[in-house]
Amino acid sequence: MNTAIITGASAGIGTSAASLFSQRNFKVINLSRRPCKVEGVLNLCGDLASEENLENILPRLNEAISQSDSVSLVHNAAKMRKDSVLDCSESELREMLEINVVAISALNRRLLPQMPRGSSVIYIGSTLSMKAVPNSFSYILSKHAQVGIMRATCQDLMGKGIHTALINPGFTDTEMLQKHLNNDTELIKSLAKMNSFERLADPSEIAECVLWAHHNPVINGTIIEANLGQKES
């Protein structure tokens, strides 16, 4: 049996990944506040930033891992907000880092020692993992941090038979993007034109990248840009 443990599988890329892994006969476990609606997914709902929650669900995760030939741990859950280096408060920054950085490390520390050879750790980054735009300070900071986490994961797991990669989606048609842009149809259309195909990526396309990355350890330690060929200014 193969298992996919996906954070934030309740919407967007996470839901698409849950659906695809399920179709490929993986046991799929969703870790998020809200349940994933894909049939057959085991939902362990709670706050990823809560150490108490992680300790409560750990026995069930370890049980699933112990029964698996391989595990794909997909760090997809993320928080996004509008702020800048001029106005982001310390409490707001800590809140962002708890989900986008600390929760990742907390899960890795608990699960990686149990995962068998042939497993993978896949991080869902962002175009903003590698560049910056105005008014997304804390999100950009956290996504840059994920690059470092992935690269450190690669080095720390040398010889363990577990590979890692970071996938950077471009603008993708998700609930989080719609909310971040206040459902501004014209703005969304303008963003869609910022790549060579002049459309938003579909979450299912990113999910295909995740599954492919799990099955191909040759990409260990790499960053995969999944942005339809972004136009550079």
Task: Give the positions of each predicted feature.
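N-terminal Rossmann NAD(P)H-binding glycine-rich loop of SDR-like oxidoreductase domains
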Residues: 10, 18
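Conserved NAD(P)H cofactor-binding loop of Rossmann-fold oxidoreductase domains
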Residues: 75-81, 229
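Substrate-binding pocket helix/loop in short-chain dehydrogenase/reductase
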Residues: 84-85, 92-94, 191
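Active-site helix of classical SDR
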Residues: 108, 142-143, 150
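Alpha-helical segment proximal to the catalytic Tyr-Lys
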Residues: 113, 155-156
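Residue(s) in the substrate-gating loop at a strand-loop-helix junction
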Residues: 126
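C-terminal substrate-recognition "lid" of short-chain dehydrogenase/reductases
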Residues: 199-226
